[in-house]
Amino acid sequence: MPISETWLLPDGVADVLPEQAQVVETLRRQALDFLASRGYQLVYTPFIEYIESLSLLSESNHDLDLVTFKVIDQLSGRLLGVRADMTPQVARIDAHVRSIEGVARYCYAGTVLHTKPQNFNSSRAPLQLGAELYGHQSLEADIEMVDVMLGLIQQAHNLEGLHLDLGHVGLFRSLVKRAGLSKQVEQDLSDLYQRKALPELEEVTKTLAFGSDFYALGRYASDLNALEQHLSQDVLNDASFKTSLDDLKTTLSQIQTRWPNLRIGIDVVELRSYHYHTGLMYAVYAPNRAAPLAQGGRYDGIGEHFGRARPATGFSCDLYALCVGQFKEIETIVAPAGQDQQLLGAIAQARQNGLRVIQLLGNDDLSSVPYATHKMELAQDQWQINKI
């Protein structure tokens, strides 16, 4: 292989150089400290597992199986999967490894691998960070998760200009159940909603039971008042539909109270991972960015695969995506070589204060540390730090 090809990386995989790595690592630490302050306990999950464990979501989310790298275990001969999402692993921990009663709060951070990018120009090796709450089915748990997600993003971004989208799969799901639609028609409608294809939606819904309601759901997806005005009374009286609608209204009201300067929108037909989520869904977007900065929702019963179904809600984000375009100059102090005790004491004190200090080796001079920003100099019998 030519030398020119030995340094090439696969598509969607990149090195993270010091100026950005410092930003990412600082955010990771701040985020985990923030989550700890909210009561979320850190867990580490293995990079590989038997595919049966990682594929628990594949029955409801075929996309996850498609993005999971698979290899043969040289010890057992069984099929292993490289984690593409940590949620199944946390579900296994909650259901089997740490099967406590009551509410459990978890957080995690680590690299996941995808066989193909999940969004345009996204990494195939994102640094996933997330938080999950198990054991509480109330709307308050969902609202807490949205609040925690926004607080975490605030660590990296000024919330000005950001946009929170709220949705609820229960609206579409209860309408599908009431109309008695087949799985194929349900999937076709979901696809039309995702593409915002209103002309096609209008044509398709003409022949469906509650067709005008399905059309109204897409036509007025971002305006709850207009949506209610155009829905039939039968649908508005449906207990499941009404509960979902009320939950969405309550969430909107409470998040507006907690985050008064945040732009919040509604999209009742945002059905990403529709077969996986079971209730409220939420995502935060930045200007000129197609993919969300963070997203999550409710996914009750996720632990059933491991023998313990529990209510669950949570969110995740890619720390690399959160830090796109952010770079930090790393202040580096250069100290002269030598064994002078006063010098060594000054170096130790500076490092203890959180500064980065490099002591020169042998006869090296400043040119050996081209990224140095400061130097340690002796002045009036005191070692001082001066900008270069």
UniProtKB/Swiss-Prot annotation:
Pathway: Amino-acid biosynthesis; L-histidine biosynthesis; L-histidine from 5-phospho-alpha-D-ribose 1-diphosphate: step 1/9. The keyword ATP-binding does not apply. The keyword Transmembrane does not apply. It is found in: Cytoplasm. Belongs to the class-II aminoacyl-tRNA synthetase family. HisZ subfamily. Heteromultimer composed of HisG and HisZ subunits. This is ATP phosphoribosyltransferase regulatory subunit. It comes from Acinetobacter baylyi (strain ATCC 33305 / BD413 / ADP1). The lineage of its organism: Bacteria, Pseudomonadati, Pseudomonadota, Gammaproteobacteria, Moraxellales. The gene is hisZ.
